[in-house]
Amino acid sequence: VLVYNGSVCDAVWSASAGYNTQTGVYGTCASLDAWGTDVPYLQSVESPYEEQYHKLLRRVIGKDYTYIEYNDSRTGEPYQSADTTHKDLGGFVQYNTLVSNGRSYRYINQFVSSRYCFDFGTDAGGTPCMTYYGYGHGVGMSQCGAVGYAAEEGMNYKQILRHYYTGAQIRTRTTRSGGLFGWLAGLFR
């Protein structure tokens, strides 16, 4: 069981963090930016073994993408530019600004990863494209990073969990008398 200060951890994870888990703008805790909750064991850590998963290009065409339309709904004209410069220390986008005819639209991102960039007009038809780095919220353990740590550094599951969940401890259930209550009491020793 993974515990922090005697309490069982909410060991969240994502598929790929893209080189490091989310870096909090408001401090060192990644969970604060992702969900607005300060969880001390969910801090930003390196996750370097994600090279093959790091850059996932996904092209998004017009209204097929449910979270954003690339045309201004009031004028029907395409957005002229996108600004993703509002990022935290780890490169995760905090919010975006879309510009259409000089007007800006700021919205909270809801994409498959919060580390991405827009690239307008890169194909022959001028289809807007997005490049994602990582896949998921980027908080807690990265599955791709964990595989890399095991393969490249020979880390076992305990070392990997300690790396991704800062300050957490692994407690082993024992078969001593007292049943479940005895085991739970052991968590607080």
Locate predicted features:
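Conserved, single-site charged/polar hotspot
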Residues: V1-R189
